[in-house]
A protein has these predicted regions:
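Structured cytosolic domains appended to multi-pass membrane proteins
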Residues: 311-331
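N-terminal cationic leader/targeting segments used for protein routing and processing
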Residues: 9-11, 19, 34
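Membrane-embedded alpha-helical bundles of multi-pass integral membrane proteins
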Residues: 31-284, 307, 328-331
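Short, flexible, mixed-charge glycine/proline-rich loop motifs
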Residues: 136-139, 242-248, 291-294, 298-302, ...
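Generic short N-terminal amphipathic or hydrophobic helices
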Residues: 16-23
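Serine residues within intrinsically disordered or low-complexity segments
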Residues: 3-6, 16, 31
């Protein structure tokens, strides 16, 4: 058997073992490409998220919606508001049921009384609460953020007032873009006045957890409260007004560490709100009776409704994001 040297291979036989197959020059045969067929699926155009949208400081105008998860969220937030507002007024054995009396260095929690030397038990209580929060996050995701977090709850109140005074989402956007007018001044003034009333009530009740609230009300309006009392009521009034009225979701994005912790507490079994890209992509408008397979479209019609109802202004279709508070309004 004779061999010839090929520039692409070490050697190839020039004598055919099978006499039926004619000899083809080694260099010529090896230089010809074997015909192939591309059987890969058609590429899917994936929507790329706008990561700079939050950094641009755009104002989020969410749309009102009703549904199963919306009703659950409203019920849980109503419970939180009522619990916060009414608990200081409850008496237990002739005194305020829940009172953190700093002046006398005593904490009253219903039938228990804690002195400074008992702070060890309060520390355990706080650690148990934190551990319970982490356990809930591992199994159910950020349901705390979406349903009972005070920041989300008070933001919901302020957004409801905004909807009441300025209208639905499109009307609010139109009002913000409109030039200054008497109607705009009246609507904005009423909104901020109601915001201030809610913020003041929140600050007043909060101070009532540290000073007997039944004495706090007459002392405040008669001017006998004292400088520190007025200071802290004013401080928490401004704090609530700014957080729920202006900062809103920015508190969750920047100031709250819990949103950052979620990435290390999630696993493959954690319940989260997510978008099924295999079913929804490629997204796009379509006619009513169009065949999705023939049109090369997924189930998502790209109506933007899931984005408009989101209180944090994210697009759930962009994948898992730390800004998502798992309120499930997009479902």
């Amino acid at each position: 058997m004779r061999f010839c040297v090929s520039p692409n291979f070490y050697a190839c036989p020039t004598d055919s073992i099978n006499p039926v197959i004619p000899f083809i020059g080694c260099d010529t045969a090896m230089s010809q490409k074997i015909p192939t067929q591309d059987n890969s699926p058609n590429p899917v155009k994936i929507h790329q998220p706008d990561h700079d949208a939050i950094a641009k400081g755009r104002k989020i105008q969410s749309r009102s919606i009703s549904g199963f998860f919306s009703k659950i969220r409203l019920s849980s937030m109503t419970f939180v508001i009522l619990l916060y507002s009414l608990l200081p007024w409850v008496n237990w054995e002739g005194r305020q049921a829940l009172l953190f009396d700093l002046s006398h260095q005593q904490f009253f929690i219903f039938g228990w009384t804690f002195a400074p030397q008992d702070f060890f038990f309060l520390s355990w209580l706080l650690m148990i609460a934190a551990f319970a929060l982490f356990v809930v996050t591992v199994f159910a995701g950020r349901v705390f953020c979406g349903y009972i977090c005070p920041q989300s709850t008070w933001t919901k109140i302020f957004m409801w007032i905004e909807h009441l005074t300025e209208g639905e989402r499109n009307a609010r956007i139109k009002l913000d873009k409109a030039p200054f007018s008497g109607e705009k001044l009246i609507r904005k003034s009423i909104k901020h006045f109601l915001w201030f009333v809610v913020a003041f009530a929140t600050g007043f009740i909060f101070v009532g957890y540290f000073s007997p609230i039944r004495n706090l009300a007459p002392e405040f309006f008669t001017g006998t409260l004292g400088g520190w009392g007025y200071f802290f009521i004013g401080l928490f009034t401004v704090f609530t007004y700014m957080n729920a009225g202006w900062l809103r979701e920015q508190v969750c994005f920047i100031m709250c560490p819990y949103g950052r912790f979620q990435s290390v507490m999630f696993d493959k079994d954690t319940l989260i709100v997510s978008y099924d890209s295999e079913r929804g992509e490629p997204r796009g408008k379509r006619k009513k009776d169009v065949d999705l397979k023939d049109a090369g479209l997924g189930s998502c019609i790209d109506c933007q409704l899931c984005v408009q109802v989101c209180p944090t202004g994210i697009d759930i279709r962009d994948g898992l994001q730390f800004q998502c508070i798992q309120c499930a309004l997009c479902i």
